[in-house]
Amino acid sequence: LRYALSVRTSLPVADHKLVQIVDAALVEASRKSGDWLVCRKGCTQCCYGPFAISQLDTLRLQKGLSDLRSSDPKRAVRVRQRAQQAIKRLSANFPGDPKTGILREDEEAEAAFAEFANDEPCPALDPETGACDLYDARPMTCRTFGPPVRSGEEGGLAVCELCYHGATEQQIAKCEMVPDPDNLEERLIAEAEKQTGKHGNTIVAFCLAG
């Protein structure tokens, strides 16, 4: 199987800086959170259900898979096979273009995506170990999920439902993660879209299946 998103383009150089900034913010949020943040290897609830990823995330994941082919070819093949199998299951009801993997952005499509395939595991998730096979290349959503992060138009703090049990709203607020204060990601997404000629979001399965 070949998909339009399988075209390989260089990852923007500054993505390394973005990853460092976001990962440092996660370390700081984890320090503040202590035992309230229970994220760990094998805790996979957030690895089920497709979520939107940018073209920058796509390039990072594809580079990660390319690196995995060099270091562990058999594991890389399994990741790709899981992605291809996922697309077979998901294409019929995909709220976007199943040929390109690009999600539609209209209200109807967004509503459909909110309820789309919530039990579908991420292709990068190793079903035997519960670990991410592309952890170092994971999307920004994965890097910021868990700690308190502002989201939505109202900018409320969102946390993983498994975390911060027993913490007050004030205590949670003090653990807030500010992942990208200078909006570097937005600029790099624009660069990635210009390089790839692809505009809009996709899901992990489409970017790893090619």
Regions found by a protein language model. Give the residues of each.
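Short loop/turn segments that flank or connect secondary-structure elements
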Residues: 1-210
